[in-house]
Amino acid sequence: MDGVVVTYTKIAAAVAVAVVVVGWAWKVLNWVWVSPRKLEESLRKQGFRGNSYRLFYGDLKESSEMTRKAKLKPINLSDDPVLRVRPFIHQTVKKYGKSSFIWIGPTPRVQIMDPEIIKEIMVKSYKFNKPKRNPLVKLFADGLANHEGELWAKHRKLLNPAFHLERLKCMLPAMYFSCIEMVSKWDKMISKDGSRELDVWPFLQRLTSDVISHTAFGSSYEEGNIVFELQTEQAELVMKTLQSVYIPGWSYLPTKRNRKMKEIDRKTQSCLMNIINKKTKAMQAGEGSTDDILGILLESNLKEQLGQGKKNVGMSIQEVMGECKQFYFAGQETTSGLLVWTMVLLSIHPNWQARAREEVLQQFGNAKPDFDNLNHLKIVTMILYEVLRLYPPVDTLFRRVDQETTLGDITLPAGVQISLPIMILHHDQNIWGDDAKEFNPERFSEGVSKATKNQVVFFPFGWGPRICIGQNFALLEAKLALAIILQRFSFELSPSYTHAPTTVLTVQPQHGANLILHKL
């Protein structure tokens, strides 16, 4: 009898194991084959075109290889930068048209290029969340730009005061000091004949790093620079991670890349804790500002502690850390990219450089630029908008569809991703005219609304409720830096300049920006 019981027990256990294995196998099969084929069928019925689904990898292998090859050679100044920044997307749209899709592993990603549909997606940001990410990406930055729903609303509300108009005015002296420090170095480096070839890219990176360190975190460049270097290294690894299929649980495996990313994160957190502790002590002694970003974050953390973790009271220390990582990187990369492309394009178009300088000298002469008159620089603003059109900091935005959704005359099934290809839209001749690929700031002479015909076709900082919180900060810093540079130098492209726009989360010059600077 006992033997029979044991036999039945073994059979039951075997059946249970078999059920689990079959269930797991079905989930895998559904993920890598059944679901992708259903989604592809649904998209094709509605007129979307793209490559046929390839098991597991989709288009990722081809896309990664095209990106790798694109980075090996520069392009001409007149070439479309999308060719180098997003070569596979460029090829897909050229081959299949605007209503196209690509495969990110087993997930189809649809290109949306209709302004009205883009507007609806941007306005209903609560409905179209960002794609689920590999947990390792959170090591790089897990702040406001990545949050959704109530968490995003809480963080946005807490951080808004740091970017109010009066607060930006208070930041101007620190910005000015950093700019003067940079141009003073240039002045000393330039020879007696008044000219010198210089790669301005690392100087502009240091400038924006210094500004964000002082204005947002009350720390020195030396303290912040360690964080910047670590975050830059992490960004390269994040780009590689995003080019591979995410497999649940893979982030826990001790692969070389996983170990490296976690090691960088440990170092970053250690550096940030030193800055946080220093700031906390200064605030407790009544010496540190409480209305910069870090001050606001730490006051919020105090509320969290006093509220004993009650919902929406404040931020946990991990949330504070996530915001610090994000603002350190975004606050530096966005403005340095805008400035370097502005200097490159003004080197190519000396007539616009001269017009910008004339306006700056009319407003300020050789005196220190002030807040109110910086906002009256019409030509400089037109130039910055045109640079943001041609070289937006982020070239593409991504969203996901969690439930079947109708947008205009299309119905997107749950499970697909949405791509809003900013750079492609910014270069679209159907939107901007025959000169869409040319540098022409005059198109913004009557403002953004007139230039875009009130369509959502220009969104270098996003659009709608989730527009970049630091947009005005970045533009103020760029106007000030450009004004100070134009007061002191003229510049042109060096013969050694190599035009190689690439994306490392933001669009930047792969081989720097060699210019010839002339003292005025």
Swiss-Prot record:
PROSITE patterns: CYTOCHROME_P450. It is found in: Membrane. GO terms for cellular component: membrane. GO terms for molecular function: heme binding; iron ion binding; oxidoreductase activity, acting on paired donors, with incorporation or reduction of molecular oxygen, reduced flavin or flavoprotein as one donor, and incorporation of one atom of oxygen. It catalyses: oleanolate + reduced [NADPH--hemoprotein reductase] + O2 = hederagenin + oxidized [NADPH--hemoprotein reductase] + H2O + H(+). Keywords: Heme, Iron, Membrane, Metal-binding, Monooxygenase, Oxidoreductase, Transmembrane, Transmembrane helix. It holds the Pfam family p450. It is an enzyme of class 1 (oxidoreductase). It comes from the Eukaryota. Its EC number is 1.14.14.-. InterPro entries: Cyt_P450, Cyt_P450_CS, Cyt_P450_E_grp-I, Cyt_P450_sf, Cytochrome_P450_Monooxygen. One of its GO terms (biological process) is saponin metabolic process. Gene3D superfamilies: Cytochrome P450. Its cofactor is heme. Belongs to the cytochrome P450 family. This is Cytochrome P450 72A397. It comes from Kalopanax septemlobus. The gene is CYP72A397.
